[in-house]
């Protein structure tokens, strides 16, 4: 209630600071040294960026969030054409450049100090300019512990949302019970799959899963583009991008100062907090896979490519839901208000092959779940092993299990509110 303004100013500072690094003399620095070469192809790199950075969340909110803003916008009246345009602009704000700027800066700092200054790939290394050699003593330990806690609870939020969506999807498709017991069983099963992926390592586990996520997501995206309101989606993608950019400064610096409600706390500040809590995990993971890239390539790629992909996904799925509502074709909003986790499944009910696409959506949620869990486990594992890129298998298994346990405890303790 008292520090919303600080969040707003901070995330804008992060974005401008990241762009400064890209276009200043520092943009020519190569992560890992002058002769370093990238470990992964651009395609695999982009796939891992997107899967780790957004993953489950974008599947959960791509349909639901635009509809919520459509019915209850921060300004003006809801359920109008103007409200639909503002809904997409607001959703773009929450999932756009600011989120990726947070990840970009954390990842850049970790990569530079680790690969160019031969320091551990651990969160403490970022603070070396301020703490000096103390980063190797108890202050550094405290920093890494806080990073581990932020990662565990940030991941637990997304994993909890993901398992709610899987459970709701199974209930929607197969009429299986959508109960707390079902969700806990799903967490255990999917955490087991994530553990197997973690043991397999980065190249055999996370990389292959990320590529599968992108491929399956592309199939669903093409499906909705072809069988959905194709022209509307393409038109609105261009218009949404223009609206986002033209209103960028107004939206980015808006603090609800002249209309005191809880809307911004519930949405924008929640998102900025969520992305910041994810930044140790995603930043560390991005740093781990970005060796060999120049600072300019790194910053611009991490900022722009996932943002454009995210915007296309939101426009295709969220835009299709708005199209159905504006034309009175279907009432997706009522279903979303009843159970937000079923939003994408109810959307598919309005197109052919609904059972096939709903099943594919469930598989994609599970795959993103596993990807987030195993990449998060690798990051926490690195934090707790002094920045080592390879650690004992038992330690990786422990952290993969711990993430599932935290998500299960939060679900049992308070459901969506606790998450």
Q: Where are the regions a protein language model picked out?
A:
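Membrane-water interface regions at transmembrane-helix termini and the short interhelical loops
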Residues: 1, 18-37, 87-94, 109-119, ...
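Flexible loop linkers connecting adjacent transmembrane helices
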Residues: 1, 23-42, 67-90, 112-138, ...
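N-terminal alpha-helical transmembrane segments of multi-pass membrane transport
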Residues: 1-83, 199, 222, 226
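Helix-loop-helix module between adjacent transmembrane segments
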Residues: 13-21, 54-58, 93-164, 172-198, ...
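Membrane-interface alpha-helices at helix entry/exit sites of multi-pass transporters
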Residues: 42, 78-87, 135-145, 179-184, ...
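Individual transmembrane alpha-helix segments
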Residues: 89-100, 265-278, 364-365
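Membrane-embedded translocation segments of transport machinery
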Residues: 135, 139-293, 300, 305-359, ...
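C-terminal transmembrane helix pair
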Residues: 296, 308-312, 358-379, 383-417
């Amino acid at each position: 209630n008292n520090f919303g303004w600080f969040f707003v100013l901070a995330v804008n500072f992060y974005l401008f600071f990241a762009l400064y690094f890209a276009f200043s003399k520092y943009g020519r620095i190569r992560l890992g040294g002058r002769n370093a070469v990238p470990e992964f192809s651009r395609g695999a790199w982009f796939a891992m960026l997107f899967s780790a950075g957004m993953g489950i969340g974008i599947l959960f909110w791509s349909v639901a969030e635009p509809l919520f803003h459509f019915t209850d916008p921060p300004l003006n009246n809801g359920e109008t054409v103007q409200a639909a345009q503002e809904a997409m602009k607001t959703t773009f704000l929450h999932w756009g450049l600011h989120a990726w700027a947070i990840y970009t800066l954390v990842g850049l700092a970790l990569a530079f100090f680790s690969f160019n200054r031969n320091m551990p790939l651990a969160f403490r290394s970022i603070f070396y300019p301020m703490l000096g050699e103390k980063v190797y003593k108890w202050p550094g330990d405290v920093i890494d512990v806080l990073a581990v806690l932020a990662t565990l609870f940030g991941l637990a939020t997304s994993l909890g949302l993901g398992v709610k969506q899987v459970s709701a999807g199974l209930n929607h498709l197969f009429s299986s019970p959508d109960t707390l017991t079902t969700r806990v069983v799903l967490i255990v099963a999917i955490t087991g799959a994530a553990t197997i992926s973690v043991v397999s390592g980065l190249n055999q586990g996370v990389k292959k899963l990320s590529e599968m996520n992108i491929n399956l997501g592309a199939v669903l995206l093409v499906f909705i583009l072809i069988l959905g309101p194709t022209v509307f989606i393409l038109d609105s993608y261009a218009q949404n991008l223009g609206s986002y950019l033209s209103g960028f400064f107004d939206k980015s610096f808006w603090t609800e100062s002249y209309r005191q409600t809880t809307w911004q706390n519930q949405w924008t500040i929640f998102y900025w907090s969520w992305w910041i809590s994810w930044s140790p995990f995603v930043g560390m993971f991005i740093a781990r896979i970005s060796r060999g890239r120049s600072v300019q390539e790194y910053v611009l790629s991490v900022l722009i490519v996932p943002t454009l992909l995210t915007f296309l996904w939101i426009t295709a799925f969220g835009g299709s839901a708005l199209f159905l509502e504006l034309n009175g074709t279907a009432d997706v909003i009522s279903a979303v208000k009843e159970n937000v986790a079923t939003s994408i499944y109810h959307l598919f009910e309005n197109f052919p092959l609904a059972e096939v696409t709903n099943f594919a959506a469930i598989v994609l949620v599970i795959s993103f779940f596993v990807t987030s869990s195993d990449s998060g486990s690798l990051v926490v594992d690195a934090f707790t092993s002094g920045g080592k890129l390879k650690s004992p298998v038992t330690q990786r298994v422990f952290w993969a299990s711990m993430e599932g346990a935290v998500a299960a405890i939060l679900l049992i303790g308070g459901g969506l509110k606790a998450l």
